[in-house]
Amino acid sequence: MLNKNYNILVTGSNGQLGSEIKELSSNYFYNFFFTDRNSIDITSKDSIRSFCQTNNINVIINCAAYTAVDKAELDELNADLVNRKAVKKLALVSQDLNIKLIHISTDYVFDGRNFKPYCEELQTNP
């Protein structure tokens, strides 16, 4: 059943994955809210909560990430803030507000040659 009142927040909308979702969104009858680091601070629970409550968000698709792998090794604090701590805050707010959260991580973890579903215990092979 299509619900035009279904509100979906997509973080990281200027990145590669967020841009793809933005492009495909016109094929669906949902209300999409595309945000970037300037429109919502995902490192702040208050910012996330306020945005979600104001816009009656039903689902969060988190595409935001610190993806500059080489730079992240030199900027560990910011990489950790975006890739771990912000995700935790999104999860906590989602849980508190009964919002579904989809978190997508895309950078260089597995080689794609496995024929079974991947799990955290598998050896990485970027």
Task: Tell where the protein language model's regions lie, with residue ranges.
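Adenosine-cofactor binding site in Rossmann-like domains, unifying the SAM/SAH pocket
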Residues: 28-50
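NAD(P)H-binding glycine-rich loop region in Rossmannoid oxidoreductase-like domains
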Residues: 45-82
